[in-house]
């Protein structure tokens, strides 16, 4: 809530504390589909956090997450430029499927067809 409040209300002095708390949360849990999707974008030179704004947004929607709207509002507030995967989606989906660490911890099972659909959604999503 601290990081969300800082971003949505331009309380920049709270960003460091909010980021620290979020980082501690990641360190004590595991990441899921959003991270699994992000690496094929980051491997093409898109900054990891920028890629995550898109991949985590579609992952929240896919998982029917109660946090989807909150995350979407934060990502839109930050006005991330549109991203699009350059490599062939079928090959990218095969790479993502190998990343069992992130897919196995996801609350919903993920198929290759799901990944292809999610990448297509990311390629058409605009958060700016």
Regions found by a protein language model. Give the residues of each.
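C-terminal charged capping/lid subdomain of soluble metabolic enzymes
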Residues: 68-128
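Active-site segments that bind and position negatively charged phosphate/pyrophosphate groups
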Residues: 1-76
């Amino acid at each position: 809530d601290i990081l969300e409040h800082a971003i949505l209300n331009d309380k920049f002095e709270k960003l460091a504390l909010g980021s620290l708390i979020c980082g501690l949360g990641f360190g004590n849990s595991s990441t899921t589909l959003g991270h699994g999707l992000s690496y094929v974008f980051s491997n093409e030179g898109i900054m990891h956090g920028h890629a995550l704004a898109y991949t985590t947004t579609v992952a929240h929607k896919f998982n029917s997450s109660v946090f989807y709207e909150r995350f979407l509002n934060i990502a839109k507030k930050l006005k991330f430029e549109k991203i699009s995967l350059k490599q062939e989606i079928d090959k990218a989906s095969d790479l993502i499927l190998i990343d069992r660490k992130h897919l196995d911890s996801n609350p919903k099972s993920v198929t290759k067809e799901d990944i292809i659909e999610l990448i297509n959604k990311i390629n058409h999503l605009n958060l700016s």
